[in-house]
Curated annotation (Swiss-Prot):
This protein's name: Altered inheritance of mitochondria protein 18, mitochondrial
SUPFAM superfamilies: Chalcone isomerase
Stored PANTHER family: FATTY-ACID-BINDING PROTEIN 2 (PTHR47284:SF3)
Family that this chain belongs to: Belongs to the AIM18/AIM46 family.
Chief place of localization: mitochondrion
Location relative to the cell: Mitochondrion
Single GO cellular component term: mitochondrion
Biological classification of the source: Eukaryota, Fungi, Dikarya, Ascomycota, Saccharomycotina
An example Gene Ontology molecular-function term: intramolecular lyase activity
Signal peptide limits: none
InterPro entries the record matches: Chalcone_isomerase, Chalcone_isomerase_3-sand, Chalcone_isomerase_sf
Keywords: Mitochondrion, Transit peptide
Domain of life, source organism: Eukaryota
Transit peptide (residue range): 1-35
């Protein structure tokens, strides 16, 4: 012991202290109290012999165990998060896999069908994160519609060598048959929510113009101009609110069982939600959600593909 103390007090003192510093620096990067650790080293640059050095390393060990406990706790939280939320884009908060009142201004409980990003493709400009949710009580409508005898015979189950789910995936990936299948699903009265979360700061006017443009881009929008004109005016009236929409806030568009659209806004910073207005012309909601979920150029291909995968598993 005397020989060890002598070596520690002389030749090995500096390297041992350096080791202590290095270890503490590493520990400080693991969510530990970096300032407190630095202070500890600064106050006791030259530990008093073996006892001083021993005390230093006992302190290191105590902090390390504390840090390890903290990290284990955080790891447990991380493991639980994927069941409750999904990461859509690093610029915005993860999307919850369920939407419930009163946190969100919606009429019932919704579960996620899929998610993705809405982008301006020619410049790869990300506009907003998009999540599509279905009412939990309405999930039974999905197999009822997409596994019906009529649709299965006329549009889905053409390849007898494949399962119904495989044929359904092919049909929903087809621009033409996907329109038919999704329109039938929308006509069933299924309740849906589109959660729109801007990736960059924007304003209500830009969001409104984007929705109007998307609806006008649907080929069926030309079939009934009177209903379309009336419905778009109702949508514009719902966006009478002015001002900015910071990134990471939510615009919620709820397609209700009667075909009405309810437009709401959730301010993440204040935690306040506001019902902005309602669109009673049912054509508007049908065209908008059809654009999200079907056709040759869905508004968000990644969202559409994600929803299709979920629909196939539920059908």
């Amino acid at each position: 012991m005397l020989r060890f103390t002598h070596v520690l007090n002389n030749g090995a003192k500096r390297s041992a202290l350096s080791l202590g510093r290095s270890y503490l620096r590493g520990f400080g990067s693991m969510h530990g109290p970096r300032v407190a650790v630095s202070t500890l080293i600064k106050k006791d640059k030259k530990p008093n012999g073996f006892r001083g050095m021993l005390a230093l390393f006992v302190g290191i060990g105590t902090l390390a165990v504390s840090g390890l406990s903290t990290n284990l706790y955080n790891d447990q939280n991380v493991k639980e998060d994927p069941w409750k939320s999904v990461s859509v884009d690093k610029s915005i908060d993860p999307f919850p896999t369920e939407l419930k009142a009163p946190e969100f201004p919606i009429s019932t409980e919704y579960v996620m069908l899929g998610f993705g990003i809405r982008s301006v493709t020619f410049i790869s400009f990300k506009v907003y994160g998009l999540g599509i949710y279905a009412a939990k009580e309405d999930l039974g409508l999905i197999p009822k519609v997409l596994d019906s005898n009529f649709l299965s015979t006329a549009f889905i189950d053409f390849d007898s060598s494949k399962s119904h789910q495989e044929n359904l995936k092919t049909a929903l990936d087809n621009p033409e048959t996907s329109r038919i299948l999704i329109n039938n699903l929308l006509d069933s009265g299924i309740r849906l929510v589109a959660k729109i979360t801007p990736i960059r700061n924007t304003d209500f006017n830009h969001l409104k113009d984007g929705l109007v443009k998307s609806i006008l881009g649907h080929p069926d929008s030309k079939k009934d101009e009177d209903r379309l004109t009336n419905g778009l005016q109702q949508l514009r009236d719902a966006f009478s609110r002015k001002g900015s929409v910071p990134k990471n806030n939510d615009l919620l568009i709820e397609l209700q069982a009667n075909g009405y659209l309810q437009v709401s806004y959730f301010d993440r910073k204040t935690g306040e939600s506001t019902t902005m207005g309602q669109v009673k012309e049912t054509l508007i909601g049908k065209l908008l959600f059809s654009q999200y979920l079907s056709g040759p150029k869905p508004l968000s291909p990644s969202t559409k593909d994600s929803v299709v995968s979920k629909l196939v598993t539920l059908a």
